[in-house]
Every structure is written in C-alpha cells, then in structure tokens.
Amino acid sequence: DSEGYFIQPTTILTTDPKFKTMEEEIFGPVLTIYLYDPADWDAIIDLVDSTSQYALTGCIMGKNKEALAEAKDRLMHAAGNFYINDKPTGAVVGQQPFGGSRASGTNDKAGSNLNLLRWISLRTVKETFDTPTDYRYPFLEKD
C-alpha cells in the first residue's frame, strides 16, 4: 500500500562507454558492463577517469596486482570510495568513512573525524612568554 519505484537488480551490457548508466549516479542495483580490449588499457583508464561528473564509488576487479595498483593511483579522483576486488556498496557508516567528490559531494568522510574538518576553521595561536629583545633572525645572517 504505498506508491513508489522499485528497480529490480539489473545488468546492462553496453558498447558505448558514454552510455547513460555509465555517466550518471544511479542509486539502485544496476551494473553496467563495458567490455574493452586489454591492449587499450592505458586509454581505458583515462576514459574511466573522464566518463562521469560523479565520483562517489567505484571498483575494479582483477588478478594483475600491477594493473590494480595503477588503476588505484590513476583513478584517485574518480571515486571517493574505491574498492579493489570487492563490491562497491560495502561502506557502513561508523565502520568505514564514506563520501564522494566531484558532483557527488565535497569528499567529506561521514563516519570519521575527518568529516568534522568541513565544519571548523583551524587557527594557530602563538603566545610568547619570554619577550624577544632582538628583532633579527641570526640564522639568516651571512657568515
């Protein structure tokens, strides 16, 4: 007795890397798959980094440790939460910091003390108890 929308778990196989579900932030059980030639790996990483204006979560699956490390490093700004060989829906607030960047947010990490930094303005205060009598900095003088 309520109205609303429900998305059945959906898998989409596309030949277009700019397909709508590849570019948009969809909150539902939707997995879009784009197959690529492994010889195009370098260009594919650039494509992944530039495909979407959103950057909430992302994941990569693979066995090649060097490729996984390269993807992690090169896709630094493509996902606020980046998963390697794990599902990209596993963040539990209070157990793992969670937050995205780009159009997905300010990359504040809810569930961690880092989130507090968005709400404060840091300031340094220095008080001297032994008043200096010399205005010069001896270490700046020529030898």
Set out the residue ranges of the language-model regions.
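Conserved C-terminal structural/oligomerization subdomain of aldehyde/semialdehyde dehydrogenase
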Residues: 6-143
